[in-house]
Amino acid sequence: MDEAFLQYTSLAYALTDIFGRGISISHTERLSGGDINKAYALILSNGKRVFMKANAKENAAFFTAEAAGLFAIASTGTIAVPHVLGAGTDDGEHVGYSFLLLDYIASGEKSASYWETFACSLAALHRADCTSFSSGKKFGFVENNFIGA
């Protein structure tokens, strides 16, 4: 896994590096979800929507671990996961924070075959060869992570 993207020192720098010069946040929407992190939809000046999770600056390891897990799941080719755009920390105006940027996936209507397709994909994930990101067995991730983070 290439973790170079995890070294962003500000959200503004991350957005410029990922999307190009002149890109800024036009609007931020707070999203509901988990209890541990804050979730946002960032609407950028180019019209693109990005999903951002945020937490205290000292909890940046949450997002490093989550990105590693998403890369591992994606490497199996069995089930769709959001694309990791970047992660890092920002000193903020008043308080520092850590962040994880992902592709924004809009909710939609489930097709008639949604649950069957999901079940087959989930089963394929559990059958996948995970030795490249496990401790050499069929279980256990190669690095510690955070359940529920």
Feature locations, PLM:
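ATP-binding pocket architecture of kinase catalytic cores
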Residues: 29-149
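Juxta-kinase regulatory segment immediately upstream of eukaryotic protein kinase catalytic domains
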Residues: 1-23
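Short loop-beta-helix segment that forms the pyridoxal 5′-phosphate
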Residues: 26
